[in-house]
Design a protein with these regions (language model features):
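A cross-family signal for N-terminal binding/gating loops and helix N-caps
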Residues: 1-113, 238-247, 260-265
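Generic detection of long, well-ordered alpha-helical segments
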Residues: 1-4, 134, 138, 192-200
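Basic, nucleic-acid-binding surfaces and adjacent catalytic neighborhoods in DNA/RNA-processing proteins
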Residues: 22-40, 54, 70, 145-265
Length: 265
């Protein structure tokens, strides 16, 4: 499943190709995604100039003067820049055809992604109550510590909650907890402010490295040009069961937290 670094990588990849370009056609081959593509999507977007491409959590916002297309990649979705007349393949669900001869094509074998529309996207019900971005200044140890008070869940479950902070999925939660030396099974309310500050620092480091590396190659994720991300070989703990811990001589163990697997030394 594409996580924040993968979505950020996609945003950075497509932006130079579609920024300030006009959408001259939208080709919808199959509108049956997680939610059906709205019938008026073509009316909303055709002949509109793309003024920016933004990311909020794991959503991409294709902004025009009168509103934004909200794209979620779901579990297996990807966006590619192609020549406008490139024949579609299986699972290619829609194209945004632009006035520079290229198209932005969405592919999604599992169809858990979505394409929605909002006049003010940050007020949309899917985005309005989300937590802060992990790489922004407002995400601090003090903030995280205050949110954790009286929470009776593990620290790993806590930081994976998008209403606490967005974009810290299973892989990056595992890596951040490993880097900060915090037991993933520890109750969130029992983590001190000092250790929360260390955890926030680790989250920022891990996510920045993943973005710089182009995302994590896990099953379905590809960059905007179809090439695979290449961060997986840089992970310290995730998916490293029984392999030596880089910080000690002990083997990395697999445990289950909240129905998700977690690897730890």
């Amino acid at each position: 499943m594409p996580e924040l670094p993968e979505v950020e990588t996609t945003k950075r990849g497509i932006h130079p190709w579609i920024h300030q370009k006009k959408i001259i056609e939208i080709i919808i081959r199959d509108k049956r995604l997680r939610w059906p593509i709205p019938d008026d999507m073509r009316e909303k977007l055709i002949n509109r100039e793309i003024i920016s491409v933004q990311r909020r959590a794991k959503y991409l916002l294709i902004e025009t003067a009168n509103g934004s297309a909200i794209i979620h990649l779901g579990m297996s979705g990807s966006l590619r820049i192609i020549e406008h007349d490139e024949p579609p393949r299986k699972h290619d669900h829609y194209d945004f055809v632009l006035n520079n001869g290229i198209a932005l094509r969405y592919r999604d074998p599992r169809r858990f992604g979505s394409l929605l529309w909002a006049k003010e996207p940050l007020k949309h019900k899917l985005l309005s109550k989300l937590g802060p971005e992990p790489l922004e200044e407002e995400f601090t140890g003090t903030y995280l510590h205050s949110k954790a008070k009286s929470r009776k869940i593990t620290i790993k479950q806590f930081i994976m909650n998008a209403y606490v902070v967005v974009g810290v999925g299973n892989i990056y939660a595992s890596e951040s907890l490993f880097l900060s030396g915090i037991n993933p099974k520890r109750m969130a309310s029992r983590v001190s402010k000092k250790r929360m500050t260390a955890l926030v620092k680790a989250i920022k480091i891990i996510l920045k490295k993943a973005i710089d590396a182009g995302g994590t190659t896990l099953r379905d994720f590809h960059n905007r040009d179809g090439s695979e991300g290449y961060c997986k070989n840089k992970l310290n703990a995730f998916d490293k069961k029984n392999k030596p811990c880089p910080n000690s001589n002990s083997a990395i163990r697999l445990i289950v937290i909240g129905q998700r697997s977690h690897t730890t030394a």
